[in-house]
Amino acid sequence: MAQAKADTPEAGLKALMAALRKQGVTDPAVLTAIEKTPRDLFTPDLFKERSWEDSALPIACGQTISQPFIVGLMTQALTLEPRCRVLEIGTGSGYQTAVLSRVSRLVYTIERYRTLMKEAEARFAVLGLTNVITKFGDGWEGWPKQAPFDRILVTAAAQDEPEALLSQLKPQGVLVAPVGKGPVQSLRRYAGDGKGGFTVEVLCDVRFVPILDGVARE
């Protein structure tokens, strides 16, 4: 839901934060992380003026930077703690990664487009984020050498249950992912029960680009 265009970035950010609270993003740590992450750093020049809209925007390689509400909702659903090691599937612009880095100990993030990964790494350097570890690779495979993770966030739609990723989660960890084969998917929260099983909660309907196997040439 895009709010009216603001006259200044400061006014835009203020309106965006109010919109997020109204839609149910209420975790103080998550709100602070979003407020301190300059979204305009992650948006292409063509869309700079729309950086503070609550809407998804196109980026390179046919991908998108997610709607801030979805970033807030997914981050909040992870129930992060400062000690958490987080795996993110799909770095994209790096915006979601940067938000995660402000509410967790370490963020491991995988991107299949080398172009996007390099651009995101440059943005992390600008922000001085030293707790983000990047990898160029197939996100669907996860990062077995660094597993298990406290939390896993998937930022592209999985057509089936993300079993390979669930196997890299700690027994009482949490994974949040959009799952579905059509243009509209269900955002699901998998919570480990400590015994090898999971409880699954459907949070809402979402629209994400699909997870693709392998790595890209770009």
From Swiss-Prot:
InterPro entries: PCMT, SAM-dependent_MTases_sf
Record's keyword terms, sorted: Cytoplasm, Methyltransferase, S-adenosyl-L-methionine, Transferase
GO molecular function terms noted in the UniProt entry: protein-L-isoaspartate (D-aspartate) O-methyltransferase activity
Gene Ontology CC terms: cytoplasm
Keyword Ribosomal protein: no
Location (main, coarse): cytoplasm
Swiss-Prot/TrEMBL catalytic activity: [protein]-L-isoaspartate + S-adenosyl-L-methionine = [protein]-L-isoaspartate alpha-methyl ester + S-adenosyl-L-homocysteine
Enzyme class: transferase
UniProt superkingdom: Bacteria
Active-site residues (renumbered): 66
Location in or out of the cell: Cytoplasm
EC nos: 2.1.1.77
Pfam families: PCMT
Coiled-coil annotated spans: none
Database matches in NCBIfam families: pimt, PRK00312.1
Purpose: Catalyzes the methyl esterification of L-isoaspartyl residues in peptides and proteins that result from spontaneous decomposition of normal L-aspartyl and L-asparaginyl residues. It plays a role in the repair and/or degradation of damaged proteins.
Protein name: Protein-L-isoaspartate O-methyltransferase
Organism: Caulobacter sp. (strain K31)
